Amino acid sequence: MHQDAMQGSIYEGSRRNTISKPSNNNPPLDMSSLNNDFGQQLDSLATGVGSGSLNGTTNPSSNFNDSNRSNISSSLRSEMEMSNNLLKNTQNDTWTSTVGLSVPENQEAMNFNEGPTGISSIASKNNSSITSKLQNNSNLSVTSSANRGRTSSVSSSYDPSFPWGPRMSSVSSGKQHLSSLSLHTHFNPSSSSTVSSDSLESSQQKAPSSSSTATPASAASEIISNKDPVVEPTHSASNAANSGSNTIRARQTTRTRSNTLPWSPRVFGPTLGYNTPPFGYPPTTSSALPNASGSSSSFFGLPTAVSASAGTSFSDISPAAPKASLENNIASNASSLLNPVGLDHFSAASGWSRDFNHLPASSLATARSSLTGNAKSGIDSSVTGMPSDNYARVVESSTAEFFDPSLASSFGLTNYRTKPLTTGFNHPRPQGHGLNTSLFNTSSGGSLKSPTFEVSNRLGDVDTVPDLPPLGSLSSRPKPSSSSRRRSQSLSAMLKTSNPYMPSPSLLSGSLANSSEHSSSPRLRGSPIHNQPVSSSKSTASLNTNNNGLRASTPEMANISTRSSSESNNTNSWPTVGDATIENLTQHEPTHALWVGNLPSGVSATTVATTFSAYGTVSSIRMLSHKHSAFLNFDSVETAKHVLEELNGKRIFFGSDPVCISFAKVASSSSESSHSAVDGLNKAFSNVSFVPSLREVYDDLINVVQSFGFKDLSKIYQILNAACELTDFAAQIPSISKAFSSRRLNAPKLRQVRKRIDNGLCTQEEVEDIAINWLDEVSDLSSDHLGNTVVQKLFDYCSDPVKEMMLERIAPHLAQIGIHKNGTWAAQKIVDVASTEAQMRLIAKHLQPYIPLLFADQFGNYVVQTCLKFGAPMNDFVFEAILNQFWVIAQSRYGSRAVRACLESPDVTEEQRVLVAAAITVYSVHLAMNGNGTLLLTYLVENMNYPHIPILLTRRFVQDIVRVCTHRLAYNSLLKIISISQGDTACGDLVVDAILDTQNDLNPNSLEKILFEQTYGPSFICKLLTHENISASHRQQLQSAVRNVLGTMEDRGSSELKKLAEVCA
């Protein structure tokens, strides 16, 4: 009876100490006092365990009276509570160890007939034996005593991949000398304390030697003593020095870390070990589960042949189980792997499986063996409950590949990128995902209500935790399948299958992926699994896209219905990918409309239409920028079929993924009218045909150049032919944030270098030494707010060979540096100081694909203008790009002004200037209807003195006289052209003839159309009648025609028509 009371008290005390929150005011540990407490408890407990009979065995102390037994029970309970608190405060100092007591030693320790003295001697023997094994075992996990305390996140010695150990040097082998490390174990606290003090002394001795460096002989050597101008936050100059400083910081702290255990609950049982309640569902007898009987056979990765029922309650546990001693319990429990799932330790990988029951049995040996497979781990899968095929492949400890939904394309291709894994104290623990005390069953002593976690077999690091299910799925009752209605991207939208402990398949963009494929795909931490029930009437279809899985990136994309197997065989239609509306807009029957998907982000309608116009005539285009797709209408069905066969699944844009093309349904008349304004490349005005390409206007350009009075056309032909051959223009310039390193630059060192160079304290040789030592960082420095000034100084003072070395590193990124607010200054300086032909050719090679985009950028256009100083023929690549993409450049805000600046530059030859003037003349009608293009047209008329400019422009304007006269910008340009020819009425008379020409097939009854457009038409006719550069005969003809048209008009209420009637009266 007293024994049962003692057992209940012990259990209640252990449970109370385990579940209660730790106090933050606990004093720091004193290893010497800890050793004394252990010795006293060993003696007292050895005396206490002898009271009563254990399974029929007899103890020497069985003749004690009831009062003695009561005192022993009370003393034992008090000591057990002290031990619980003691080990609980030191739980995070416990590290995984595979060293334990051998079988003979266990048997010797389990002999109770030797009395208290024998027990003490055996304990001493076991402690010394364990200490010797710890010191002789080369596979022991060791950590510096300095880093056991909670360190600051800005500490230079903090390493997320090795949270409680010192930072390992990047050039070392990753191993540290045992003299600077201490062993953390619960076997012998005194030995741990001794090693810790030795470690501190060793680190203090090593610190001066490691930090002492030779004084540089010169100023430059002092500057470049640290060759890298980049600060690595995870690097430390001296591991031992930092270890010693952190030891002081660890001693001063009084904050305990008992609440930093992983999410899986650990119950501190009466055997002074960490027990885990049964997780099995249904209950199993596998030794992979914790043995509730108190035996050491099933504690955390120590597999034996002994198993116990998972349903054993804690009330049946005796204070000391048969054949179990305190030392053995400590060896098998307290020093075992406390956190097989999420506790930070030095192992670079962790074994994962889809079976949740294996988690408590994941020992250090299992984690280490996952690198080489289960066959080499030395652990029997039948004992641990971990099947060999459930091991996930591991990745490096510093980075992991994960799914980024922000990079997912509109039609469902999964994108991956790498991200440094953060771990340690600042890592978000699973408590943030909603796991709290409500998840524990109060009647089972801290066990979870149901193990319905869907632990996917995925990539993970040592601190990766499985995704938690919604709170509603933690019931032991099986859940029915959810309805097919799509819900928001929340945890409650997860599919609850009838089997609560088996992962369910998910619908991935119209194709079924089995559970193994799904579980192997990496996902963001805490991201929900968007599963969808699949109807059996739908057949599965798979699409091979270079081993990239298909995943619905948005809920609406998952609604794309799958097609039949016969339809899925058509690879040209890409049936299983697309945006939210592609299912309703695409079809298999050939049409003159095409849907183009997987377009690069930021691509313009101009670029898309120009690219596809090379394969056929494009009549219109409609962009869906938010869906990364577009709809193109061609002139015929045959053209659309030809484009689909030629370009489907190919990379047609520089640096982008293959495009997806399929036939689209022809839009209705209502949708056509709503998009009539978006017609071709010109988005500034409606009903305008596509601007012709350079090849189409090649002969026209030559004729205009000849009209300007040029006879020698050899150089003209050379530039035009080279411009026609250009086809590799980029669709976009990569963002500097993707190429720029995330490392923090050393601002003080950069300021020091710049100041010394500005003050003349460094010779040219010293400056070149700095440049050579910083070659690997010069590209990143060019875009930094301080680094770009240093790069400019380096290019100013270095010789040509050194500048070429730096330029080889910078030139591939020169375009993206040039459009950066800081990098544009460095890019302009690099281009400006280029003096050799090799440097100029290298710059031209890497800038030419980006010339149109640089012209349209507020910073990049200055980089292009700086290239003009190269002189001909080195700067011909700029004018070749202008001629090839003239309309794209001229219609942009910065491009039109940059072209005008190029025409004014003294570094431009006459051949280059006349070619640009001829291009302005040929594209004059399109430029007149664009606000930015009007600037170039005005510059040509007012500032360029080539002959016959007014008459050449007028002849082109009268070809589309109605649109020119009714456009708010174009008609002003036409009046300016007429006014430029002083005393010459040829241009004005030509315009009047075009308006009155009834034989014009393109614009019959032009005057009526102009007057009926009452916004700008009547105003233009009124100004034309009062213009002085029109002959009298043509003026009278126009007045007579206007009176006749006004007589037929019923509505003449506008002010412009009234004014026009007064002029013609």
From Swiss-Prot:
Span of domain PUM-HD: 712-1065
Amino acid composition bias (Polar residues), ranges on this chain: 16-44, 134-151, 169-189, 247-262, 434-455, 495-522, 529-551
Source organism: Schizosaccharomyces pombe (strain 972 / ATCC 24843) (Fission yeast)
Modified positions (Phosphoserine) in chain numbering: S506, S511, S515
Limits of the RRM domain: 592-666
Gene Ontology CC entries for this record: cytoplasm; cytoplasmic stress granule; cytosol; P-body
Composition skew (Low complexity), residue ranges: 59-77, 190-224, 236-246, 470-483, 559-573
InterPro entries, A to Z: ARM-like, ARM-type_fold, Nucleotide-bd_a/b_plait_sf, PUM-HD, Pumilio_domain_protein, Pumilio_RNA-bd_rpt, RBD_domain_sf, RRM_dom
One Gene Ontology molecular-function label: mRNA 3'-UTR AU-rich region binding
GO biological process: nuclear-transcribed mRNA catabolic process, deadenylation-dependent decay; stress granule assembly
Pumilio repeat locations: 771-808, 809-844, 846-884, 886-917, 919-954, 956-993
The name this protein goes by in its record: Pumilio domain-containing protein P35G2.14
Keywords for the protein's UniProt record, in alphabetical order: Cytoplasm, Phosphoprotein, Repeat, RNA-binding
Key word Kinase present: no
Pfam families, alphabetized: PUF, RRM_1
Annotated positions of the Phosphothreonine modification: T260, T554
Stretches for region Disordered: 1-78, 130-265, 422-573
Localization, UniProt: Cytoplasm
Source domain of life: Eukaryota
Location (main, coarse): cytoplasm
